[in-house]
């Protein structure tokens, strides 16, 4: 199946016959003192997706495997059809929620073998997704971050300018200023003040430079000088009394589903955490994607005192490997913050029950949970989340059972997490550096 032949089809999906939307369930009568922004991630468009009798030909992203139960909004062995992505953005547009901006943390192309893509195709996919967002939200400032699949070959994002960096810099000009465009072209990262919130700066990092499979950065102590740039930018924000939200694709810390596996190379992880700790008074939140799951982390200092709240958002794509039992329902989320100091107050997670949507032929995006209500916490501050995770660690914790259900975006209510699984989850949430993480594993495994 040729990927290139399907892009116009995606872009020309009739806007007039968009999917049906459910009524948003988030509280509508908010005080005007609360600001809001959306977070979407891991769209992973598969333009080849189509319903056909031959289940091996439904989508390129199944890599020849039989799609399990394909419908108009996708299949768990396939990346997102355009109709699924459009339904997510249509829901956001028609949700009735007022938002100041949106963050979009990368990965637009599908999971397909390297020979099935090219630099040109990757740029076309990112263009498609960017145009979709700009057409639906012409007046909303959007802050993108590049993902490891937003390049060809995948994962190999370079430390110098490239066709992809130049292309996205041009595509994202409506949202970014000249200085941001300049650093984006050079290294795939940038910082930008939020137009509607002048005291808030978004720092969009290219953490793909630190990703294990990226051979372009092997043995480089500061790829693209991003560490030096980050420290200078945070120091400037400190002096200018700005607050900062960090966004990126690949998160810091350890993967919660694997033993002793940092999401990025250990040296880079320790270096980033050191910078984040030193500027924790400036950083008001960190937001990532990449894992396709809903998880959180709390960055603490060397003495275990909580400093920063870290959120990893679930994907829009529902794709999983043939041998994987669990996957995620598609999800998007809304954060609430306090204007002025940009303290994070709450998070509202929405999702699409993919099985139900395919059966009914319409997308009923609905509320999954409101974080403070689900866990009975006051806000999203590091101390509040740290106390919550201490509850997760207790034996037979109902709070953790709830967390693990939401981890898969309510995909499978029968999913269980044994003691080993729980230890990996809790250690990853509370311990982002190698020393504290290893100590946690030794203590509990």
Swiss-Prot record:
It comes from the Eukaryota. It is an enzyme of class 3 (hydrolase). Its EC number is 3.1.4.-, 3.6.1.15. It catalyses: 2',3'-cGAMP + H2O = 5'-pGpA(2'-5') + H(+); 5'-pGpA(2'-5') + H2O = 5'-GpA(2'-5') + phosphate; a ribonucleoside 5'-triphosphate + H2O = a ribonucleoside 5'-diphosphate + phosphate + H(+); ATP + H2O = ADP + phosphate + H(+). Changing residue 149 to Q: Nearly abolishes enzyme activity. Requires micromolar levels of Zn(2+) for activity. Inhibited by millimolar levels of Zn(2+). GO terms for molecular function: ATP hydrolysis activity; phosphoric diester hydrolase activity; zinc ion binding. The keyword Coiled coil does not apply. GO terms for biological process: negative regulation of cGAS/STING signaling pathway; nucleoside triphosphate catabolic process. It is found in: Secreted. Detected in blood serum (at protein level). Its cofactor is Zn(2+). GO terms for cellular component: extracellular region; extracellular space. Keywords: Disulfide bond, Glycoprotein, Hydrolase, Metal-binding, Secreted, Signal, Zinc. ATP binds at residues 111, 148-149, 257. Residues 1-22 form the signal peptide. Glycans are attached at residues 66, 128, 219, 235, 353, 364. Its main location: secreted. N-glycosylated. Changing residue 111 to A/Q: Abolishes enzyme activity. Pfam families: ASMase_C (PF19272), Metallophos (PF00149). Monomer. Homodimer; homodimerizes following 2',3'-cGAMP-binding. This is Cyclic GMP-AMP phosphodiesterase SMPDL3A. It comes from Mus musculus (Mouse). The lineage of its organism: Eukaryota, Metazoa, Chordata, Craniata, Vertebrata.
């Amino acid at each position: 199946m040729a990927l290139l032949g399907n892009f116009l089809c995606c872009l020309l999906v009739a806007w007039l016959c968009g999917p049906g939307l459910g009524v948003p369930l988030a509280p509508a009568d908010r005080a005007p003192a609360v600001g809001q922004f959306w977070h979407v991630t891991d769209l992973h468009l598969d333009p080849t997706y189509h319903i056909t009798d031959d289940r091996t030909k439904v989508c390129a992203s199944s890599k020849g495997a039989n799609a399990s139960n394909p419908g108009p909004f996708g299949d768990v062995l396939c990346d997102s059809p355009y109709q699924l992505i459009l339904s997510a953005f249509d829901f956001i547009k028609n949700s009735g929620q007022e938002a100041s901006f949106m963050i979009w943390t990368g990965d637009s192309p599908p999971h397909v073998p390297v020979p099935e893509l090219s630099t040109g195709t990757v740029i076309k996919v990112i263009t498609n997704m960017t145009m979709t967002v700009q057409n639906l939200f012409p007046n909303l400032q959007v802050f993108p971050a590049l993902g490891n699949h937003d390049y060809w070959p995948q994962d190999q994002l370079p430390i110098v300018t490239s066709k992809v960096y130049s292309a996205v810099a041009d595509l994202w000009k409506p949202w970014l200023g000249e200085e941001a465009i300049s650093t984006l072209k050079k290294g795939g990262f940038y910082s930008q003040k939020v137009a509607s919130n002048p005291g808030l700066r978004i720092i969009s990092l290219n953490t793909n430079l630190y990703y294990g499979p990226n051979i372009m950065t092997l043995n480089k102590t500061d790829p693209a000088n991003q560490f030096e740039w980050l420290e200078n930018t945070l120091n400037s924000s400190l002096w200018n009394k700005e607050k900062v939200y960090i966004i990126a694709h690949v998160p810091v810390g350890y993967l919660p589903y694997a033993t002793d596996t940092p999401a990025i190379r250990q040296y880079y992880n320790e270096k980033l955490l050191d910078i984040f700790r030193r500027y924790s008074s400036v950083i008001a939140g960190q937001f990532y994607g990449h894992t396709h799951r809903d998880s959180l982390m709390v960055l603490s200092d060397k003495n275990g005192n909580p400093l920063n709240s870290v959120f990893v958002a679930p994907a829009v794509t529902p794709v999983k490997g043939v041998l994987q039992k669990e996957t995620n329902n598609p999800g998007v989320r809304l954060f609430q913050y306090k204007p002025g100091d940009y303290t994070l107050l709450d998070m509202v997670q929405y999702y699409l029950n993919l099985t139900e949507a395919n059966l009914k032929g319409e997308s009923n995006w609905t509320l999954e949970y409101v974080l403070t209500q689900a866990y009975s916490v006051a806000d999203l501050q590091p101390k509040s989340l740290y106390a919550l995770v201490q509850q997760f660690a207790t034996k037979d914790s109902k709070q953790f059972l709830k967390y693990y259900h939401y981890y898969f975006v309510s995909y499978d209510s029968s999913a269980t997490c044994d003691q080993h699984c729980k230890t990996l989850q809790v250690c990853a949430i509370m311990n982002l550096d190698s020393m504290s993480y290893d100590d946690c594993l030794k203590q509990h495994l």
